[in-house]
UniProtKB/Swiss-Prot annotation:
One of the protein's GO biological processes: nucleobase-containing small molecule interconversion
Active-site residues, as the UniProt record annotates them: 240
Class of the enzyme per the UniProt entry, highest EC level: hydrolase
Record-linked NCBIfam families: PRK10443.1 (NF007761)
An example Gene Ontology molecular-function term: uridine nucleosidase activity
Organism domain of life: Bacteria
Recorded family membership: Belongs to the IUNH family. RihA subfamily.
Name the record gives this protein: Pyrimidine-specific ribonucleoside hydrolase RihA
GO cellular component terms listed in the entry, alphabetical order: cytosol
Keywords: Glycosidase, Hydrolase
Keyword Hydrolase: yes
EC number: 3.2.-.-
InterPro entries, alphabetized: I/U_nuclsd_hydro_CS, Inosine/uridine_hydrolase_dom, IUNH, Pyrim_hydro_RihA, Ribo_hydro-like
Length: 318
């Protein structure tokens, strides 16, 4: 039985790969793709979502742009990681279709309302759109099965010593989401830094020799550049956002623990920190399933096998 999902993203190399991974599997039914600012400015992330869906010949999936800035803070982007376009590296097609006239929140609300099954939200950028949806449509909470997000860390951050980028960009939005009572799966840096793609994995992808695999290999070639900085201690590049889709497809690839997670919204030193109570020290009930480990080889094999699906016949089936 296929699971209806809405992908809320800020493409971004790893967002694009998460989207490509999701659309290779009939077990997931994408009802919509929505975008926010984050890895690049809102106009660029929206355009990037349209370009990736054009590459995949999926103009049937409605796309809408969302929040242009965080709830109460100034916009921050990660152009040092993702380049001038947000998807530097491959030559992507121009969009073949237009975004919806409604904004991201209203498109999500419409699709959740219309769905005959509870919908899973998959945010892989800042949580602004999701927070706005939850705040403005309380009547739809019961129709959201789960929020599977990329963000946070139980350990150290990657944007500040304490905070991961997506949560740091809009901690107030993250606070709303984690306090919502909706089941959450948190794919934080603890697991995504283990989900590294290596040079030899990129060559496996390139050898698939279809247009989508070629695009992903070229995305990863560029993505590797930032992560080769010795300060990170990486051998490869961490594929953060695809962990959300991989968990939906095969949760057995991951080690997980139910924890209480709180968001720091005030501290000068630890703003945006996800405080993960792994040892039940606070006595507060768990509000998230937090991923801590991954079968890296199984994850890479899933990605490679998924990219092999994108034959010309598959791409032209609609």
């Amino acid at each position: 039985m296929s699971r209806p999902i809405i992908l809320d993203c800020d493409p971004g190399h790893d967002d694009a790969i998460a989207l490509i991974l999701a659309l290779a599997h009939p077990e997931l039914t994408p009802l919509a793709v929505t975008t926010s600012a984050g890895n690049q400015t809102p106009d660029k992330t929206l355009n990037n979502a349209l370009r990736i869906l054009t590459l995949l010949n999926r103009s049937d999936i409605p796309v809408a742009g969302g929040a242009v800035k965080p709830l109460s803070r100034e916009l921050m982007i990660a152009d040092n990681v993702h380049g001038e376009t947000g998807l530097d590296g491959p030559a992507l097609p121009a969009p073949s279709f237009q975004p919806q006239a409604v904004n991201a929140v209203e498109l999500m609300a419409e699709k959740i309302r219309q769905s005959d099954k509870p919908v899973t939200l998959v945010p892989t950028g800042p949580l602004t759109n999701i927070a706005l949806l939850l705040a403005s449509h309380a009547e739809l909470h019961a129709k959201i099965e789960r929020i599977v997000l990329m963000g946070g860390a139980a350990g150290v951050g990657n944007w500040t010593p304490a905070a991961e980028f997506n949560i740091f960009v809009d901690p107030e939005a993250a606070d709303i989401v984690f306090k919502s009572g909706i089941p959450i799966t948190m794919c934080g840096l603890d697991v995504t830094h283990q989900a590294q793609i290596m040079d030899e994995d990129i060559e496996r992808i390139r050898a698939i020799a279809n247009p989508v695999a070629k695009c992903v290999a070229e995305l990863l070639d560029f993505f590797m550049i930032y992560h080769r900085d010795p300060k990170w201690g990486f051998v490869g590049a961490p594929l953060h956002d695809p962990c959300t889709i991989a968990w939906l497809l095969n949760p057995a690839l991951f080690d997980a623990q139910d924890c209480w997670v709180g968001i720091e919204t005030q501290s000068e030193l630890t703003l945006g920190m996800t405080v993960v109570d792994r040892y039940q020290l606070t006595g507060k009930p768990a509000n998230a399933t937090v991923l801590f480990g991954i079968d890296r080889q199984g994850f890479v094999d899933l990605l490679v096998d998924s990219l092999a699906v994108y034959t010309p016949t598959y791409l032209n089936r609609r």
